[in-house]
């Protein structure tokens, strides 16, 4: 699936190492390979964006290595491809040796996988399923400031799905653990790949059922009910969290205006 980059190759270049992304001038590099000193490197074709190929190069650059979060404000499709590249780069870096027998592994030529040269075990990139849920109570939405968001951003609740747990059970558990309330009328909305580090966000909307807000201080700085027309600082557009909030606001406007 990979090949040597030639002079005439062009497109979008995802140059990644250790979950970092090369962002010269703060942007994903686009153009001919010669412009970015990539000729002769090995590249993996991981997709297409606006008719142009998207290449993954497993390489560290001395300067301008940043987080994929820095391209979150770009088009959602391009952000997702950048996230795919970072996740694949980390997968290949962390699977050089077989976890069963310890022998070297090599990449598959037909799919995104690593194969053991000794016991023939096959490894695929792991994806961690997560839930994210917007909870509505009349004309208000539950928003929280997470301990990892020290910039004042308030968002909806989210968390990882545990082993042996359904998505619906994960929603109920995470909401109770983080906020102390119960929800009802759960409805699936959409999903979004989320490369922090290798998640798949499954998005839901729910209605408040019962309970008073009691936050988990290990997870949240604060949480509260916010009227739909008086909201705090929100996650950026293009994120599934923002989509859930905007959908909830639209429902409130339709009912209360």
UniProtKB/Swiss-Prot annotation:
It catalyses: a 5'-end NAD(+)-phospho-ribonucleoside in mRNA + H2O = a 5'-end phospho-adenosine-phospho-ribonucleoside in mRNA + beta-nicotinamide D-ribonucleotide + 2 H(+); NAD(+) + H2O = beta-nicotinamide D-ribonucleotide + AMP + 2 H(+); NADH + H2O = reduced beta-nicotinamide D-ribonucleotide + AMP + 2 H(+). A motif (Nudix box) lies at residues 159-180. One of its GO terms (cellular component) is cytosol. Its EC number is 3.6.1.-, 3.6.1.22. The keyword Nucleotide-binding does not apply. A divalent metal cation 1 binds at residues 158, 178, 219. This is NAD-capped RNA hydrolase NudC. It comes from Citrobacter koseri (strain ATCC BAA-895 / CDC 4225-83 / SGSC4696). The gene is nudC.
